[in-house]
């Protein structure tokens, strides 16, 4: 597929409880269309949940978020775009369960780590006008 | 809707069965049950996730609090019927280092 002909799906999601599941339902349909495996589909859904929750929570904005799925023959690209104040992705600490147990440490903070583990590539672009997370899942050849 | 569909006791175990998205709300329901049962000197729990096929890290983080509570009492948390993506998520987080995991409830009860 050339760039001009890549099909895409766009979602606009309000910051409301459990609305991340709207994104995962869409991802399930796209994964089936692309004939991705159950494993790949599950990984995409989980990463998307975390990315959407992060956009909800960290954008410190009540503005809707946008999710764009771009389908190609060999990979799915997903952009999660918020209109918040932006953040420094390099400043995110890698969580460790051993240190979270017994140290009165906040138990949360796993989202970015999970996204990076579950997807093939992850990139953040952030400014004062918002953050765009771009993540891809390559289709395995079985 | 996310909810606990059953809580029962078998031998030394408290079995908690959930349904739906394992999010913050469901995690808080589970930890409430654990806190209540710990007051009754029940320290061994099995969480049956057969009807919960999807999780988020906030719900999973509450399970870290559950583990913390049970470690203080020499208790255990076992997980069964995990969907593959839930098992993978918990493994990435390191949760499965601190839980026993089983394919079925019967296997969890027989541990």
Predicted regions and their residues:
Chain A
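Short beta-strand-loop-beta element adjacent to the nucleotide/active-site pocket used for signaling
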Residues: 71-78
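A conserved short beta-strand within the histidine kinase catalytic ATPase domain
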Residues: 63-70
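Bergerat-fold GHKL ATPase/HATPase_c domain
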Residues: 1-46
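Glycine-rich phosphate-binding loop
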Residues: 104-119
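Short coil/turn motifs at secondary-structure junctions
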Residues: 74, 83-85, 140-142
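Conserved ATP-binding N-box helix of the HATPase_c
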Residues: 38-63
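Glycine-rich/acidic phosphate-handling loop/turn and adjacent ATP-lid/helix
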Residues: 78-107
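Flexible, glycine-/charge-rich segments associated with ATP-binding catalytic modules
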Residues: 1-12, 100, 116-142
